[in-house]
Design a protein with these regions (language model features):
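Bacterial N-terminal signal peptides
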Residues: 8-16
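Bacterial Sec-dependent signal peptides at the C-terminal "C-region" and cleavage site
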Residues: 16-24
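Glycine-centered tight beta-turn/hairpin loop motif at sheet-sheet or coil-to-beta transitions
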Residues: 44-46, 85
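Conserved catalytic-core segment of clan PA serine endopeptidases
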Residues: 23-34, 67, 71-122, 129-132, ...
């Protein structure tokens, strides 16, 4: 491995280590109903994250959202941007983190799949998982639950979305920034939030895991396509 590649890996991992966990999309708009149908809130005693619907009883999220011993549940807001406490739709009865995930290794795949006790209502539909790798310059729609302004101390539960652009794509990771003059992006509740393709059908391409200096960092899902599909199939059969 040459020095250029080693230097790139070092810089990327250093950026991930220094980043904060993603908590909210700052400067974003209320998500439209199409995005709402794919996206779910994940609650715990310590806070909340965002998840993506893979099946009516299967949800994909960030592994760091799962704390051993915590009772997790999924829910959503009342719709139309209403800043209300979410309805609890189901408890989480099983969690499977990526086998290479480690809290001590910031470069490990920050992914987990949840099995729900009760299937989600029909207003939710499974997302289409893309096997295409991300590339620099790709525009993606990011979605997540959390505060919509940096000065908010308590964030109402509203699903928001924003257009972000991939500025770097490297070995299963992507770094994204706002498009144009907008200062929008991930900030401290969006962990596990989806990144959808911008053109055509909203296929799932990435998952938000952290933010730093107005940049959003995400796991590029094409590298983990096989694990996601295999784990989903195993959990769906239980």
């Amino acid at each position: 491995m040459n020095r250029t590649i080693l230097a790139a890996i070092t810089l990327l991992l250093a950026a991930i280590v220094c980043a904060e966990r993603a908590d909210a999309l700052v400067g974003a708009d209320v998500a439209d109903r199409t995005i709402q149908r794919y996206t779910i809130a994940i609650g715990s005693p310590k806070g909340r994250c965002t998840g993506v619907v893979l099946a009516q009883n299967i949800v994909l999220t960030a592994a760091h959202c799962i704390v051993p011993g915590d009772k997790l549940w999924v829910g959503d807001h009342a719709g139309g941007g209403s800043p209300t406490i979410p309805s609890r739709l189901s408890a989480v009865v099983e969690t499977v983190s990526h086998p290479l995930w480690s809290r001590k290794d910031a470069g490990s795949p920050d992914l987990a799949i949840l099995r729900l006790a009760t299937p989600l209502p029909d207003r939710f539909i499974p997302v289409t998982l893309s096997s295409r790798h991300l590339a620099e310059g790709d525009n993606l729609i990011a979605a997540g639950y959390g505060k919509g302004a940096a000065e908010e101390t308590r964030s109402p539960l509203v699903l928001r979305m924003v257009l972000l652009r991939v500025t770097r794509a490297f070995r299963g990771w992507a770094i994204l920034a706002s498009v144009g003059e907008d200062r929008a992006g991930g900030a401290p509740g969006d962990s596990g939030g989806p990144l959808f393709s911008y053109r055509g059908m909203h296929s799932l391409m990435g998952l938000i895991v952290s933010i730093s200096d107005r940049q959003t960092r995400a796991v590029a899902l094409a590298a983990h396509y096989g694990w996601i599909k295999e784990t989903q199939a195993k959990l769906s059969g239980r």
